[in-house]
Amino acid sequence: MKKSISKFILVLLFLLLFSTQCEDDIPPFTQETEQQELAALKTEIENLANTSFCGDAFECKFIAFGSKPCGGPWGYLVYSTSIDTEELENRVERYNREEAIYNTEWGITSDCAVNNPPVSMNCENNACVAVY
């Protein structure tokens, strides 16, 4: 008899504990939260690119930046090889991927204009400049 009462109490405690379990402390993502995270990542990327400089030892480059809902990039980010280009390219790839997911998830629309890449790059006052 004592054994069945003990089991009953144990089961009751078990059910009580799980019925009062707290929800996760992680708030759900909202469109605004995701937009803020994308904006912060974009700022990091632009700041890194803006620290680059050009000269005889460094080459100017550009990379497709952003993900338009219709496809293609929003524009092109100009930078030089004076910075950690692998780090920059990885961040841009991540940003482009996350923005594409954001666009799909939240039903974002835009014009479907195609942004052409630069036709060449110039080094002016130690800064890379795109020529369109």
Predicted feature residues:
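Bacterial Sec-dependent N-terminal signal peptides
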Residues: 16-39
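First exposed extracellular module after export/assembly in secreted or surface-exposed proteins
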Residues: 2-3, 31-132
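Sec-dependent bacterial lipoprotein signal peptides
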Residues: 1-19
